Amino acid sequence: LLPLAAAMLLLVIAFVSIFVIETRHRQAEDIARTAASVETMFREQSAEDIQLVRSIMELVLQDQHLETALRARDRQRLLELSTPILNDIRARNRITHFYYILPDRTMLLRVQAPTKHGDRIDRFVLQEAQRTGKPFWGNEQGPLGSFTLRVAYPWISNGEVIGYLEMGIEFEDIMQSIKNFLDVQVLVAINKSFFDRAKWEEAQAKNVRPVPWDEFPAVVVLSRTTPEIPAPIAAYFGALKEQHGKRTFEIDWEQRVAQTIVVPFANLRGQELGELVVLRDITLRAAERRRGLIGVVLVSTIVGGGLMLFFHFL
């Protein structure tokens, strides 16, 4: 019976191995689909938001009262006219940034923060709008560290650039849309070298849920759609020194399991700033996978044992 037992054992091992390989193959395909969905959703949501902001800005650019106030550099009049506009588009369209900028890129008015003005703006989006004389847009970091999807338009009157109009949607709002649409959690970790700590802490002091600078050694988690970072991801961020490109892995903590998809996050200049980390809860699927594996092992063992007994008593 030893040759038969050996053959049965090999058969069981082969059957279980095929099951495991097939399960892992399906899992890899599922992760790849999720990763592709995240990247596609990010592009599509950004494109939709850009089109939305452009449509609103093109209406604002037609307002003769605003044009007159901008030409006169009348900050108070611009604020009076623009505050109701910002309140409306913030409530309806998630637009939180609204700027009037002079032709030399000096900030004339931040409608959302009217006491802060007079600084020179060197953001890439605005520089490109100035250089090309055309609208330009993209995700870009602000002076206080937040990332915003920005759109900048030259304000042209009688062939003359009298200033620039810029609007923006917080990056976190885009992440929230991805979370809601794909049923995932999203974390954005940015290398600390891209931040001014004093400005970061100034901005965080105003937040309902401030992000502590010392939470992790090398990165700050700028955006998070989950109130608590899972322990394995916190350990990952704690050990993170540099970005390593796109990758996927699985984590488990507190009887939960999640697919983890890491996508490099870059700015408009092509600088790799950090990582977009997406978590998809697969706790139920992982439990089904374990039950399936246990079932395959049990069935294979029972069938193999039954055949051995059959041939033994034959």
What are these regions (language model features)?
Residues 7-77, 87-96, 149, 180, ...:
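Juxtamembrane extracytoplasmic/periplasmic/luminal helical "stalk" adjacent to the first N-terminal
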Residues 280-303:
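Membrane-interface helix-start motif
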Residues 58-59, 98-104, 186-193:
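Short hydrophobic alpha-helical segments used for membrane anchoring or interfacial signaling
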Residues 1-25, 297-311:
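Extreme N-terminal signal-anchor transmembrane helix of membrane signaling/transducer proteins, especially
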Residues 102-109, 193-195, 268-271:
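Short, glycine-anchored, charge-dense loop/turn motifs used at functional sites
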Residues 87-169, 176-178, 247-254:
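Extracytoplasmic/periplasmic ligand-binding sensor regions of membrane-associated signaling proteins
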